[in-house]
């Protein structure tokens, strides 16, 4: 088993499927557009709370957006 798992995501794909801009999604979950951009590019790992808010806003299950590598 790997010791250093990295949380990856398909946030951009899920966001585009919902026809949302980064700014639109950011407003739905109460963060900045820069935060959404940083999550999408893997520069920022969201908290559990933010990850769940993103899933709710995008009507997706956690495992549909986030995965470990």
List PLM regions with ranges.
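Alpha-helical residues within the helix-turn-helix
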Residues: 16, 27, 56
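Short alpha-helical DNA-recognition segment
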Residues: 19-38
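Short, charged recognition helix plus adjacent turn
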Residues: 1, 66-69
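A short, Lys/Arg-rich alpha-helix, primarily the initiator
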Residues: 1-17
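Short, conserved catalytic or interaction motifs in soluble domains
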Residues: 41
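Residue-level signal for the short linker/turn that defines the boundary of a DNA-recognition helix
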Residues: 9, 19-20, 46-49
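DNA major-groove recognition helix of helix-turn-helix/homeodomain DNA-binding modules
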Residues: 49-64
